[in-house]
Amino acid sequence: MQLKLTKTLPFSENFIMADSEEYKTVIGISFGNQNSSIAFNRDGKTDVLANEEGNRQIPSILSYHGDQEYHGVQARGQLVRNADNSVTNFRDLLGKSHDELTLHHCHYSANPVNVEGQIGFKITVQEDEESDPKEKILTAHEASVRHLRRLTESAEDFLGTKVNGCVMSVPVYFTDAQRKALESAANEAGLPVLQLIHDPAAVILALMYSEEVLIDKTVVVANFGATRSEVSVVSVKGGLMTILASVHDENLGGEQLTDVLVNFFAKEFEKKNGIDPRKNARSLAKLRAQCEITKRVLSNGTTASAAVDSLADGIDFHSSINRLRYDLAASATLNRMADLVTEAVEKANMEPFDISEVILAGGASNTPKLTSLMESIFPEQTIIRSSSSVTPLQLDPSELTAIGSGVQASLIGHFDAADIAASTDAQVVDVPHLTAPIGINEGENFVTIFDIETALPARKTVEVIAPKEGAAFIPIYEAERSVKVTKVEPEPIDEEEAFSDDEEEEPEEIKERIAIPKTLIATITLPDVSPNAKIELVLQIDAEGKLTASARPKDGKGTNVRGSTA
C-alpha cells in the first residue's frame, strides 16, 4: 500500500490527564490583524467574552495621545485625528525582520520602520502631563505584548479570576519563526500558550463541538479576514483533522471590500462638490469609518446609507447604496475570493464534488454574494455554511476561530504541559495517510472501508452477509478513485407552452466520486459459515501500512479467521 506523510491536527483525546491542575482557567484567543476575540468554556458551553466596554470583537489597535495609551475601540477612534500615533496590523509583523517586509497594511496609521533590522513603529508620547513629548519606538513584539496583556486583563475582569493560559489559533501560513514570536509575546504578556492550533481546525472544532456531530468528511474552510484570506481543504476522519491543501492571499480581505465603498462614495462626493475626500488623510479616515458600518449593514439588508458630517471643506455627505450595486462594484474582489477557493480545491487534487461541506468564516464572509458564488462552484450535495446560506451558521463567522480555540482550551486546560508538548511533537503530528481507498465488494458495488487520507494507524469493524450456501469468501482490495458521470435528460417542453425561439436544454451532467477495485491485497475465507449469517469483519492498518484482517460469524457458529498482509 502507498502511504504519504501528512500533518494531522490531534484532538484532546490524544492527551493524558495529569494529576495536577496546573491550568485551571484557560481561555481561547483569536488574535487577528484588525480584531481579536476571547472565548471561554463554562458549564460545557463556549462563549465569546465581552471586554469592559462591551465589545466581543476587540480592535487590535494601540494609540497614544499625550501620556495616555488607548486600546481597542477607543484606539480605533483615534485613527481619524491621531493616525500617525496609532499602531495597527502588527500581528503578521511578528517574527519577521525588516528585510522580509514585502507588504503591510498600515496605510492609515503609523508606518513600520527599521529598528536595527527588526520592525517597529515611531510614535510620540509623554511620560506625564508636565513632560515634553518625545519620540519612542514601539516594536511589533512590544505592541503585541501590550495588546495581549489588555486581552488578558479583560478576560480576568469578566471571569473574576486569574487566567492561567490560553490556546491560540494561527493561520496555516505562519512560519515557525512567527509562531515562536507569538508565543514569546504571549508569555511576556503573562499569558502562557498551551497550544497553537490552525485557524481552519479551530473553525471546524467550533462547529463540531456546538453541533455534537463527528462524521468523516472533507471540508473547505474559507477564512476571509480583514486584511488577508486563507482557504484550506481539511479531511476530517476518525476525529482527526488533516490539512490537505492551503492557499492564501495576503492582500485580499474585508479592507478591499471597504475600499470599494470608499471609492464609490468618494467619486459621488467629488462629482457633486468638486473635491476628492481621498486626498485628505482625515477626510479619508472619516469616510472609511463610515464605509465599514455601511458594509456591515449591507450584509443583512438590501440597502444601506452613508452619512459623514463635514467630510471635506466643511461639506456634509449623505448617500445610500443598494446591495445589487455594491455586489457589482465589488465583483472583482469577490471573484478573487471565489478563485482562491477553487485554487485550494485544485491544489488538493480534488474536484468540487469531492467536498462535503464549505464553511465561510471571518468578517468578510458575511457578504451574501460570496455564498451565491460558492453555490455556483459546488454541486447541490455540498453543504454551504455561511451567515446567509440555506444551512446557516448558528455562530458568528467572525467568532469561529475564537470559539474553536476556547473549546480546545477547555479540553486540554487540566493536562500537564509536558504531555501537551509531547502530543504535538513532530513524530506524533506528522503521521502516514492512505493514498488509496481500501474496501470490499458487496454485490456489484465496492464498499470503501478506509477512505483516502485516513490517518494511520486505523481500525474499523464492518458487517457482511454470508452467501446462501457455501463458504464465505471476502476479498479485500486497494481501489483507485474514478469519476462517475450521469447524464440527466431535461424535462420535455410542452409544445403548447413553448415559444418558437426557445432553445432545447442540454442534458445535465452529475459527477460523483467512486472507487474501483484495482489490487487484491488480502482474502478472508470462512469455510463452514451458516447460510446468510452475519459476519463481523475487522480491519486494522498499522503505521507502516500493514493490514491485519479478522472475521467471525456473529452467531458463533463456524471458525474465526485471521490473517495479515506482508
Curated annotation (Swiss-Prot):
ATP binds at A39, F40, N41, R42, D43, G44, K45, T46. Disulfide bonds: none annotated. The keyword ATP-binding applies. InterPro entries: ATPase_NBD, HSP70_peptide-bd_sf, Hsp_70_fam. GO terms for molecular function: ATP binding; ATP hydrolysis activity; ATP-dependent protein folding chaperone; heat shock protein binding; protein folding chaperone; unfolded protein binding. It holds the Pfam family HSP70. Gene3D superfamilies: 3.30.30.30, 3.30.420.40, Actin, Chain A, domain 4 (3.90.640.10), Substrate Binding Domain Of DNAk, Chain A, domain 1 (2.60.34.10). It comes from the Eukaryota. The modification Phosphoserine is found at S86, S500. Keywords: ATP-binding, Nucleotide-binding, Phosphoprotein. One of its GO terms (biological process) is chaperone cofactor-dependent protein refolding. GO terms for cellular component: cytoplasm; cytosol; nucleus; plasma membrane. Belongs to the heat shock protein 70 family. This is Heat shock protein 70 homolog C57A7.12.
